[in-house]
Amino acid sequence: MNRLAMTWLGSKALVIACLLGVTTAQAGGFANPTMSASGLGVANAMVASADDVSAAAYNPAGIAWQDGIQAMVGVDFQYRNSSVELPAGIGTNGGGAGNPNHLYASWMPHDGNFGVSMAYNKPYEIDNNWTSTGQAALDLNRLSLDAIFAVNSSLALAAGIDWYLSTLSMNTPGQSFASSDKTSFGGHASMKWKAAPMWSVGVMARLGGKLKYSNSLSQAFSLKLPDEITVAVAHDVADAVRLEFDANWSRWSRVKSLNDQAISMRDSITLMTGATWFWRENSQLRFGYAYDQGANKGTAYNPLIADQTAHKLSLGAGGDLYGVHADVAVGYAFHPKKNVSGAYAGTYRDRRFSFALSVAKRF
């Protein structure tokens, strides 16, 4: 693809993103599923494909088919419109949406069976601020290091450690708390199997860490992150189109409280499907849809974790440009209104947008 065409494509994608706005693509609970622009373009259905260096986050076993040294850097610009309809009027959620960065690197020798990868991203985030309920903000970054083993030309395995770095602040009626945690760890393992010509299967399993917070007033509590597993299958159609379907299960029932706030959450399922059209050499167009089940129960809803079931649409594009590979993507999440009873009764509404940009280089 020539430079003029890539410049045109990039400018059109940027214009579309500006027209749509920028926002978050948060998943059930308080997860942030977008790990790269290429992933967002296919609604994060990437575990079976795992065909660029962001596989370090989606499925590190995919690095086994990516020779040499690679690096990627990017950002996900986010915007959110969240509110609750009450008998007395509309209550606005004053919490914002961050712009999480991501950084990935990998090394896989051309004739070797062992490789390594590194992923740094923001997989979880809370930022909700309600006038009557209070405020909660969790900023969490994860550093993952993996060892990759290519069993043969069709099967690869990977395993690694997760290091969580987080800060938490809360202000609720009668309670204020702020702390940070830099000593929490978890682990994960993954597999990619090229089961047949034009077919691939991926599995990614992660054990959630346990974050521990304390402050100078001897207040302390722990926050468990969910265990999760994703199973995926991808199929290439005539070398021109790739179709993928991913199913993710997250164990949000591990989350029981947020400091003094009781939390009642259910395990959730997210279904993701994506299509990639290889319309030119080294260039792609991407489309995706995801159904994301909310984890917050309607009968015991806590707006400090204001997640809702969502339908997500996304599109993206990528191509080589000036010696690097650039990807852009936009996403929109529609959340049907959620009618809540109990202590925080009301009709909760949410809309989310996202614009992601990633740049990768092979050395």
PLM features: residue spans?
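Short, flexible loop segments at the rims of nucleotide/cofactor-binding pockets, characterized by
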Residues: 48-51, 93, 135, 221
